[in-house]
Amino acid sequence: MKFIKKLISIFVNNQTLFRNLFAIFLYKLNLIPDEYKGRVNSIYKKQQYEKKFLKFNLKYNDLGFYYLDPIPTKVFLNKYYEEIYWQSRGDKNYPIRLRDIEHYKLLKKIYPDFDKDSKKVLNFGAGHGGLSILLYVANHKIYNFDFGQTNNLFSERWNQVNDLCKIDSKFDLIYGSHSLEHVQNIKEIMKKFDEISHENTIYFFEVPNCINSKKIVPPHTYYFTRKFFYNYFEKYDYCETLDNSGIKKNDEGVVIRFLSKSRVKKNLLK
């Protein structure tokens, strides 16, 4: 009986993995229904890409992060995100998640006056666009950056950005939820953030906490600790690691949440 319970537990905890393996098996035998072929093809290609990720090495930088070595090229990553990442997932059309609500509540708690007037917001790696929608409803101007493009939900104050180099204005909030770990060059990204920020810009990031991680998790290219945020910003207003229930865990939480109304340290941008 214990063996049966263990098998059931393994299956329940890995439902997505087993479902994808079965779908790929049917796909290879040309038995998958036509309406699912595109999705399963993307899942299959994603697995092939992930094998390539696992061939890289993981190195540590004293500024507080691990990174893939050699870092994948921009062409490699762009193709992956444009053609495979979102196509292999089914959650982009579920725009509001508990995490988005938690982020909005924390933003309002740390900066109570944030909604008093309309702000210009960059959602970096916007994906499903959860916080973008909440801030849009609060009358802010939204700019969504994502290789896979966020759903075009509104006709005003809702903008799609596909190239950071084309941005030349300043933002009041630069936000990224589980996106910094996907970039190709963190120094270039932080330099660009500094260029499009002003002295009162709020930075809000959430990333996986990798202080004890020595394992590559495709398609992540960077693996952060809180030390990264302490090193890169002049000060911070909130920097905690949290478990899956949102409870603070010193350095042992599964994610890092960081908020700061300060500048990126100039000496790190040279």
Predicted features along the sequence, with ranges:
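Class I S-adenosylmethionine-dependent transferase superfamily signal
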Residues: 193
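Short "lid" loop at the C-terminus of a central beta-strand within the Rossmann-like core
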Residues: 208-214, 222-223
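Conserved beta-strand signature within the Rossmann-like core of class I S-adenosyl-L-methionine
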Residues: 200-209
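Conserved N-terminal segment of class I S-adenosyl-L-methionine
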Residues: 3-169, 173-177, 186-190, 226, ...
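Helix-to-beta-strand junctions that scaffold the AdoMet/dcAdoMet cofactor pocket
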Residues: 183-184, 197-199
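Short alpha-helix
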Residues: 221-236
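Histidine-centered divalent metal-coordination motifs
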Residues: 178, 182, 220
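A short helix->loop->beta-strand "cap" motif at the edges of active sites that frequently abuts
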Residues: 140, 198-201
